[in-house]
Amino acid sequence: MKCPKCGSLNDKVLETRQSKEGVVIKRRRECLNCGYRFTTYERIEEEHIEVIKKNNTVEPFNKEKIIRGILLASKNRPITQEQIKQIADDIEKYLLDEGKLKVSSAEIGDLVKNRLKELDPVSYLRFVSVFDGFEDIKDFEEFIKSFEKKI
């Protein structure tokens, strides 16, 4: 660690303590060149997911957008807030576990669709109709026919 007083890279750690939450490590150090004592803090750098939108703009992943989309699709349906939050948490965890730090909005939409299909077919249909941009009744009819074939 570079000494803030003389700039030397030679130091020794005198004391190490972990925070109560276990997320920060505090180290007391002494410069071997000038004897100056200083404190450093270490914490895990959190990974951040970036979403590539349809228009190729990039924005930070926002779990609340997933929750809002599912809430809208599942209005007046037998899906709890806890289930919706769990879906959003599971999608975020999946992306981080897979190391997908840059992901398309289409892929996120597909993950939501897959979960809703298992949970509630009506909410699934509502979500797909908005996400895939259904424009008229014919789009619904075609989708329902293909959905029924898969069942």
Curated annotation (Swiss-Prot):
Domain (ATP-cone): residue spans on this chain: 49-139
Keywords in alphabetical order: ATP-binding, DNA-binding, Metal-binding, Nucleotide-binding, Repressor, Transcription, Transcription regulation, Zinc, Zinc-finger
Entry GO MF terms: ATP binding; DNA binding; zinc ion binding
Function: Negatively regulates transcription of bacterial ribonucleotide reductase nrd genes and operons by binding to NrdR-boxes.
GO process terms (BP): negative regulation of DNA-templated transcription
Family to which this protein belongs: Belongs to the NrdR family.
Pfam families: ATP-cone, Zn_ribbon_NrdR
Free-text comment on the cofactor: Binds 1 zinc ion.
Keyword Electron transport: no
Cofactor(s) needed: Zn(2+)
Keyword Magnesium tagged: no
InterPro entries: ATP-cone_dom (IPR005144), NrdR-like_N (IPR055173), RNR_NrdR-like (IPR003796)
ZnF (unnamed) residues: 3-34
Annotated protein name in UniProt: Transcriptional repressor NrdR
